Regions:
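Active-site histidine-anchored catalytic micro-motif
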Residues: 1-68, 73-77, 83-85
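Conserved phosphate/anionic-ligand binding catalytic regions in large, soluble enzymes, centered on
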Residues: 1-2, 75-88, 115-126, 205-226, ...
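Short beta-strand elements
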Residues: 13, 91-93, 124-132, 136-142, ...
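Flexible, glycine/charged-enriched surface loops at secondary-structure junctions
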Residues: 18-25, 57-61, 79-81, 186-193, ...
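Short, Gly/Pro- and small/polar-rich lid/capping loops
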Residues: 98-124
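Metal- or metallocofactor-binding catalytic centers and their adjacent structured scaffolds
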Residues: 141-231, 282, 311
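Mobile "lid/hinge" segments at catalytic clefts and subdomain interfaces of large enzymes
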Residues: 243-305, 310
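Catalytic core of soluble alpha/beta enzymes
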Residues: 302-303, 319-526
């Protein structure tokens, strides 16, 4: 550190470097305060100039850096006498660098076992251990409603164990087939690891080895790589400063068939998008959810029932009645100005393929009628987004909805299943504004990141979401923070894995001074 460091680094960069040498200048708390990247020379380009030109500084580093250089303090250049002391120096590690593996990050062992998810269904869990002793553990959640284009969940179909839901075959595939192929590979080369498993499987939807087997290994390797760098996974993903945590949204009312009432729409969601901070957003969710129980009791004259996703069961077939009850709970709590709605319609579950109609409010309707109905809802209520308002194969319906509904965002889940090819098709057809990012749907971290990258480069949203059969410590939270996603689906403020996600966001915010909850006031459409 010091006044001369930029000049020295500029000279070093312009000179002839030995193969594999990287020159980095990184300030932390110097006398002139915290700077970004060396005030900042990197690859002969200042940080501000790179930012103005749209150059990603971390991409610039990827072009020159190698693992050995970052491991060896002797490869760095230090000058000056008033800046950063050696003991304060922050060595910046850039993930997925080309070249040789970082010392110690090679995979030493891969081991799978059967555990149970938060709905007490068996799932695959995997431990990956690197040569330096770093451990990554991950499990594969599953949803209650699963799109037909998702990666295949391999189960044993043995009625004698968990009614056929056990996953011993998938566990064996990890231990006997995947593990031998990955041992010795670099845990930090995520793309190579995922490519290896996809090639071992040899099918489009990962039906041979099981998407649940492949996904668990993929995430475990991701975690092991971050652990090898001694960084939280979300920080490893971000590659830079964490500026925001996403706005959580809460599924407070569950649709489907409950207590004899068939509510077509699956999830009625509250988003406290104008909360002052993440702590207030969580408090709003808890208070509104609890108050909603009282409001439902007054409406029905009976105790509210708990739905399949732990929200309250919808007390009416009429979506407007449900929305009005939620709005009353919001108003009663004094949060009318802070909250908006979202909907997950999950209309694939309500689609009659033979007659090509949808069940809605006691009747069968065409996609034209469904689009017109939802459009009227968006004109009456404020929605941040509406998800899966049509069947997973109703491309024409989605195009029509996207064209005609302009007061909210049209988001897809079953239509896109986090698959880059399907997201590209939806973009080219102008069918959606964004998609729900559930990495286990597509089956590997690499494919999930590719889906997010395509969406962000083409002006679409990625909205991370857990699964109803969730896990504690879900990687979707690391992705949401690391990718700086503006808003997410969290589920209702009840049950351990959902509360864990909320606590995760509050911890991240607390650990990064200046970090705040994302703001979307300037992008909502109402």
């Amino acid at each position: 550190g010091g006044p001369g460091q930029e000049l020295t680094l500029s000279y070093a960069i312009s000179g002839k470097k030995a193969p594999g040498c990287v020159c980095l200048s990184i300030d932390s708390e110097g006398t002139d305060g915290t700077t970004k990247v060396a005030g900042g020379i990197t690859d002969s380009t200042s940080y501000d100039a790179a930012e103005a030109k749209g150059i990603n500084v971390f991409d610039a580093l990827r072009g020159h850096a190698c693992f050995e250089a970052l491991d060896a303090i002797g490869d760095a250049v230090f000058t000056g006498n008033t800046g950063t002391n050696l003991c304060d120096l922050n060595i910046m590690y850039v993930p997925e660098l080309p070249g040789k593996p970082r010392k110690g990050s090679r995979i030493r062992s891969v081991h799978a076992r059967q555990i149970i998810d938060c709905k007490c269904r068996p799932m695959v869990e995997v431990d990956v251990i690197t040569e330096d002793g770093s451990i990554g553990t991950a499990a594969a959640p599953t949803g209650s409603s699963v799109g037909m284009y998702e990666s295949f969940v391999l189960r044993d179909n043995d009625p004698a164990e968990y009614n056929g839901l056990s996953v011993h075959k998938a566990v064996a595939n990890v231990n006997d087939i995947i593990a031998p192929a990955l041992i010795g590979m670099d845990a930090m080369d995520q793309a190579a690891i995922d490519r290896c498993m996809i090639e071992l499987d040899g099918t489009e939807n990962k039906t041979n080895l099981g998407g649940n087997a492949i996904y668990s290994v993929s995430v475990a390797c991701y975690r092991a790589a971050a652990a090898s760098c001694k960084r939280p996974l979300y920080d490893y993903i971000a590659g830079g400063r964490i500026k925001t945590v996403p706005i959580p949204s809460f599924n407070v009312l569950n649709g489907g068939m409950n207590a004899g009432i068939r509510q077509a729409f699956n999830e009625f969601i509250v988003m406290p998008y104008r909360a002052s901070d993440i702590e207030q957003a969580v408090e709003i969710a808890v208070k509104v959810f609890n108050r909603l129980g009282t409001v439902i009791r007054a409406y029905t004259g009976a105790e509210p029932r708990v739905g399949g996703s732990y929200g309250w069961c919808a007390p009416s077939e009429d979506p407007e009645v449900c929305l009005d009850l939620i709005q009353k709970a919001i108003d009663d709590c004094g949060y009318s100005e802070q909250c908006a709605f979202a909907l997950d319609c999950a209309m694939t579950e309500m689609y009659d393929r033979e007659h090509k109609t949808y069940y809605l409010n006691g009747s069968q309707v065409t996609n034209d009628e469904l689009v017109a109905y939802v459009k009227r809802l968006t004109e009456k209520y404020n929605f941040v987004f509406i998800e899966d308002m049509l069947d997973e194969d109703d491309w024409d319906g989605f195009v029509k909805a996207h064209r005609e509904i302009t007061r909210t965002y049209i988001i897809a889940d079953d239509l896109t299943v986090s698959n880059p090819a399907r997201i590209r098709r939806a973009y080219e057809l102008k069918a959606i504004d964004g998609f729900i990012l559930k990495p286990n749907q597509v089956g590997t971290i690499t494919e999930a990141l590719a889906a997010h990258k395509f969406a962000s480069e083409h002006g679409m949203f990625s909205v991370t979401s857990g699964r109803s059969g969730g896990v504690v410590g879900d990687v979707v939270m690391d992705l949401a923070v690391g990718l700086q996603i503006p808003f997410i689906k969290n589920g209702c403020p009840r049950s351990g894995e959902r509360i864990d996600k909320l606590n995760f966001l509050m911890r991240v915010k607390d650990n990064y001074p200046g970090c705040h909850m994302a703001k979307i006031d300037d992008i909502v459409r109402f």
